[in-house]
Amino acid sequence: MNIAKLIDHTILKANATKEDVMKVIEEAKEYKFASVCINPTWVKLAAEELAGHDVDVCTVIGFPLGASTTETKAFETKDAIAKGATEVDMVINVGALKDGDDELVEKDIYEVVQAAKGKALVKVIIETCLLTDEEKVRACELSVKAGADFVKTSTGFSTGGATAEDIALMRKTVGPNVGVKASGGVRTREDADKMVAAGASRIGASASVAIVLNDAKGATDNY
């Protein structure tokens, strides 16, 4: 298995400098990761630097809380695509899900899917660490209904990250035709292999190089 092609090589910390982002971009070229996952401010740079390379440009929408308005998320998506993003990882409205406002949650996802249609993959971050199993299932079902390409466990900025149990539940819920992305706390090759075995089709990690090289030291970042 070519683990590198399953990895979104990620740098989302607030204090990331241009030098930090360029390092991630160069590593993505070298190791041929699926994508680089960066904050929207770096999308244009990444798109320019990765032109001609088989590495997608992934960014985050409504990140990390998911509490911006639907209109804002849709605008962010269009803006990111205009600047060169080919994948977007959006955060659901977690509070609305917990309130049982499925209509709002679905519309939120749907509007981002429409904004990205034909131009970018949409991954929906459900923030599993804040949800009950019933809420995880509902979030996945609403994501599929709204037309998302992937469901994703975590932002890496909340109280917990991906678990094999959550990946298995998400995979069971969405079926074989929607992707499942494990992110948050995936730091070693062993971690990554467990997630893939549980049903993950993509891994979000900042320790991507350590994972590919099977360096057990991994990394210390939450993502």
From Swiss-Prot:
The active site is at D89, K152, K181. GO terms for molecular function: deoxyribose-phosphate aldolase activity. It comes from Bacillus cereus (strain Q1). It comes from the Bacteria. The keyword Lyase applies. It is an enzyme of class 4 (lyase). This is Deoxyribose-phosphate aldolase. Pathway: Carbohydrate degradation; 2-deoxy-D-ribose 1-phosphate degradation; D-glyceraldehyde 3-phosphate and acetaldehyde from 2-deoxy-alpha-D-ribose 1-phosphate: step 2/2. Catalyzes a reversible aldol reaction between acetaldehyde and D-glyceraldehyde 3-phosphate to generate 2-deoxy-D-ribose 5-phosphate. It is found in: Cytoplasm. SUPFAM superfamilies: Aldolase (SSF51569). It holds the Pfam family DeoC. Transmembrane segments: none annotated. Its EC number is 4.1.2.4. Belongs to the DeoC/FbaB aldolase family. DeoC type 1 subfamily. Its main location: cytoplasm. It catalyses: 2-deoxy-D-ribose 5-phosphate = D-glyceraldehyde 3-phosphate + acetaldehyde. InterPro entries: Aldolase_TIM (IPR013785), DeoC (IPR011343), DeoC/FbaB/LacD_aldolase (IPR002915), DeoC_typeI (IPR028581).
